[in-house]
């Protein structure tokens, strides 16, 4: 009877370890998926920055140039935030408990989702500005 109970406990422990590793891997994959979506938009950041720079060179309107500079700074800020996140992100999580890993990855997912939102907002705003002022 004791052997059966011991075997059940060992089986349960092994299954729960596999389940924890799967949870960690699934959450990591979610973080990476959002990261990849943001990286796809990085080229739009650079394109919009170049278009804003061109607008500033072609126009002498100080109000338009000030707005273009502000939007360019927002694009730089979004890009810098992404770079900073990538440099600090640790996908390995060695020596941490399951709960610590899940907490870390959850926080990282929230951060990268906020960066994605910032990318979307700055790209949309700067694209609309460029489109509106291209012919001026």
Explain the meaning of each model-derived region.
Residues 34, 38-39, 97, 101-136:
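C-terminal amphipathic alpha-helix
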Residues 34-76, 80, 125:
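Post-signal-peptide N-terminal segment of Sec-exported extracytoplasmic proteins
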Residues 1-4:
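Positively charged n-region of N-terminal signal peptides that target proteins for export
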